[in-house]
Every structure is written in structure tokens, then in C-alpha cells.
């Protein structure tokens, strides 16, 4: 069963597509939802100058784009950029953002194979079976060593 995302901001004419999952988002709210629910699948290649340009051009959110650009110049962690996006428009409550940040902290304490397992699970949710299977195989090989 899907969820309804109420969009209060401008809807983009051209979507932003996340490379790993091929999921396209058309609004700030969809972007927030995707980031919040797929943190282990989001990488540096997703949160780049291309994203800030899309936010500026398609969503008319220049202030958010400027904040992302500043974080990119500082080579900030991916999680810090995601938090900036989540906080910006108030789509998630401060408590939900705190939970997100706690989950980010928890990820930093996991072993690499545990993070990879979470990534594989994420790909499985998106029916990217080959990618998920390859990661699961790598984990099994790693654990057998």
C-alpha cells in the first residue's frame, strides 16, 4: 500500500532521479520522503551540485540550494546534507529529524558488512534483485573469510 505525500511546494517539470534506485522525485516533499526512508542508499553522487541545481531551477528553492552548495564546498558528510534538506521546509517534525540523526549516528557505529546488508535490503525493496543479490554474495564471502 502506498502513502500519500501532500505537496505544498512547487512541483518540478523535470524530476530528479536517484542513480542507485532510479526513483524520480518531483517535489521538495517527495525528496524529503525519499531521503528519510532510504538513507543507506543515498550517496555522494546523489547529493551533488546536480541536486542543488535541480532544487534551484525546478523547485525555486534558491535558499536551500545555496545551503547545499555551501555544505558541498566544505565537503560535508552526506548525512549532514540530508539533515539540512529535511530541516529546511519543515516537512518532518523536529522529533522525526532527531530520530533521523540518531539513525545516522547508529549507522556510523555499524561494521561495513552490516551497512552493506542494509543497502542490499533497500535494493530488494525496490526490486533490484541482481544488485541486492550481488551485495548479499559479497557479504557472505566476507564473512566466510
Model features per residue range: what roles?
Residues 105-142:
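Alpha-helical segment of the N-proximal tetratricopeptide repeat
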Amino acid at each position: 500500500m502506498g502513502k500519500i505525500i501532500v505537496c505544498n511546494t512547487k512541483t518540478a517539470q523535470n524530476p530528479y532521479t536517484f542513480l542507485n534506485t532510479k526513483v524520480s522525485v518531483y517535489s521538495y516533499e517527495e525528496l524529503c520522503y525519499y531521503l528519510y526512508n532510504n538513507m543507506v542508499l543515498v550517496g555522494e553522487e546523489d547529493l551533488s551540485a546536480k541536486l542543488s541545481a535541480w532544487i534551484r531551477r525546478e523547485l525555486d528553492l534558491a535558499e536551500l540550494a545555496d545551503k547545499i552548495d555551501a555544505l558541498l564546498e566544505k565537503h560535508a558528510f552526506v548525512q549532514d546534507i540530508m539533515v539540512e534538506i529535511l530541516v529546511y521546509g519543515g516537512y518532518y517534525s523536529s522529533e522525526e529529524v532527531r530520530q533521523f540523526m540518531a539513525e545516522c549516528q547508529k549507522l556510523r557505529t555499524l561494521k561495513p558488512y552490516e551497512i552493506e546488508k542494509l543497502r542490499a535490503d533497500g535494493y530488494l525493496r525496490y526490486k533490484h534483485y541482481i544488485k541486492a543479490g550481488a551485495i548479499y554474495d559479497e557479504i557472505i564471502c566476507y564473512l566466510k573469510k
